[in-house]
Amino acid sequence: SYLFRKMIPVFKEAGYRVVVPDMVGFGKSDKFESKYDYSYEHHIEVMKELVERLDLKNATHFGQDWGGLVGLRVVAEMPDRFQQVIVSNTGMVAGKGAAAWITRRMVELAVWWNGPITFEELKTAAKDALNSENSSTSDGVSMFTKWIAHSYYSEDMDIVGIIETFGRLELSDGEKRAYEAPYPSGKYKAGAHVWPYLIPTQLKENEKYWQEVYEKWDKPFLVAFGGEERITIRMKDDFVNRIPNPTIITLGGA
């Protein structure tokens, strides 16, 4: 939730109630010490329970990064509680039948093939995908599987280094301490280490909700991707092509 520290006051001052949860394994939420205790499905169930306990109604869902992968499933499974959706630099990756199974196994194979990837190797792999105007889909896929391998095999991920490098930010000392505060040691970062590896584990389920909910969506849906986004931009087409009548904007300098 610390990521949204600059957005929250704006909405509060405008009179809105703002709910920004720390997902299990992150922030002030409880953390499993083993990466094998985490699952994509568990995160969805926890967020659904949060919505029910807070009895959220007529809510606006804003999803960025895992706020799409998890949040869009939450919205799809309890759509009556949400009046509109905003997505930014995220997606809900999906697949059909055998293709979904093959995609998952190919990702797992790529992670195994890459083996442990150092932070310096990851930055080198990301250079073309993030900085080139002409980066290809294969550049993005290669970079992303290396990112999964780096995080999966890490024992103590450099949280601040990841944020500064891939967010193109220069954090203050206070911000660095805040980002590292939830993780006294590497064992508390199991969630961060395994989450990217979990992305292809719900492809068929996600496709089901694309077809049953989002392709029939009749409420406001805003697609607001950054103009400089190089990785998740490939998921923007799903929203453009599968959501009926979405509003589409591009965020400059983001």
Give names to the regions the model predicted.
Residues 3, 26-62, 66-247:
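Flexible "cap/lid" subdomain of the alpha/beta-hydrolase fold that forms the substrate-access gate
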Residues 249-254:
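Short glycine-rich catalytic loops that host catalytic nucleophiles or stabilize transition states
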